[in-house]
């Protein structure tokens, strides 16, 4: 009897200890333990710290680039014209009128021509739409524009006055006409032109015609020199068949021609 009682007591003790251990594991994780309660009495400091961390993380996420696609494109980008980097042509526009002038754009808005190419004559032509281009001075960072009175000037912002229609002529020159301004009764287009002294002409002038040399501009763009593409082809040499060497026959001594004897026939009669 004593052994059976001891065994029962031992088994009951094991069952109770196992049940208590299982209750500890099943307890909810959200309840703070005694160690946590002792470190942060009241829970106010922890909540404020967690709230501050959450707000700082949310602010960092919102300020990260690409977090809000709607913000992209606002700010300074809305006030300036963004052109595609592909298809840009950088160089100068040479007008063959007079002694020849390069179209140049000044930072103060002045537009004229210079015989010698300089920093002001470096232009950048970019496409706006099909057949429509814009012209920007690289040094002045201003756009070529034509007012409603036909006067050429430089604009700090890209507007409709800065749009020109580019046409290729048969003599390899280009003409640039305003895309929005033209003579209303006849519908004649207004062209970018320079006079013989290099001054800008008004596009509304009846003398400014696409057939005149004052409206012809030759684009001079710097193209990168590509390395010469070449390759070497090795042509296999045809092996010549070995020439058969004829055996040398020793030259025999020339045969002596035998002495020829002439026989005369003698006919005897009687």
Curated annotation (Swiss-Prot):
Region (Disordered): 26-84, 237-257
Highest taxon in the source lineage: Eukaryota
GO biological process, one term: positive regulation of cell division
GO molecular-function terms, A-Z: growth factor activity
Lineage start: Eukaryota, Metazoa, Chordata, Craniata, Vertebrata
Gene: FGF5
Function, as annotated: Plays an important role in the regulation of cell proliferation and cell differentiation. Required for normal regulation of the hair growth cycle. Functions as an inhibitor of hair elongation by promoting progression from anagen, the growth phase of the hair follicle, into catagen the apoptosis-induced regression phase.
UniProt xrefs under PANTHER family: FIBROBLAST GROWTH FACTOR (PTHR11486)
Bias (Low complexity): 50-70
Protein name: Fibroblast growth factor 5
InterPro entries hit by this protein: Fibroblast_GF_fam, IL1/FGF
Regions of compositional bias (Polar residues) in chain numbering: 75-84
Keyword annotations of the record: Glycoprotein, Growth factor, Mitogen, Secreted, Signal
Species per Swiss-Prot/TrEMBL record: Canis lupus familiaris (Dog)
Family matches, as Gene3D superfamilies: 2.80.10.50
Principal location: secreted
Pfam families in the cross-refs: FGF
């Amino acid at each position: 009897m004593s052994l059976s009682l001891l065994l029962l007591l031992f088994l009951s003790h094991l069952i109770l200890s196992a049940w208590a251990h299982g209750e500890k594991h099943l307890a909810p994780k959200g309840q703070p333990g005694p160690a946590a309660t002792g470190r942060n009495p009241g829970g106010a400091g922890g909540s404020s710290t967690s709230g501050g961390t959450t707000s700082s993380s949310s602010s960092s996420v919102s300020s990260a680039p690409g977090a809000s696609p709607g913000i992209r494109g606002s700010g300074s980008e809305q006030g300036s014209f963004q052109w595609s980097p592909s298809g840009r042509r950088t160089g100068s526009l040479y007008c063959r009128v007079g002694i020849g002038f390069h179209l140049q754009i000044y930072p103060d808005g002045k537009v004229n021509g210079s015989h010698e190419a300089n920093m002001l004559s470096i232009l950048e032509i970019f496409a706006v739409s099909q057949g429509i281009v814009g012209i920007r001075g690289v040094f002045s960072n201003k756009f070529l524009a034509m007012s409603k009175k036909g006067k050429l000037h430089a604009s700090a912002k890209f507007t409709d006055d800065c749009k020109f229609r580019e046409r290729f002529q048969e003599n390899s020159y280009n003409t640039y006409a305003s895309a929005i301004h033209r003579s209303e009764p006849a519908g004649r287009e207004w062209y970018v032109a320079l006079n013989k002294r290099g001054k800008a002409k008004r596009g509304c002038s009846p003398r400014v015609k696409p057939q005149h040399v004052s409206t012809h501009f030759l684009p001079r763009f710097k193209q990168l020199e590509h390395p010469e593409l070449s390759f070497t082809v090795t042509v296999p040499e045809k092996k010549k068949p070995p020439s058969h060497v004829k055996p040398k026959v020793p030259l025999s001594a020339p045969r002596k021609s035998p002495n020829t004897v002439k026989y005369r026939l003698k006919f005897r009669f009687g």
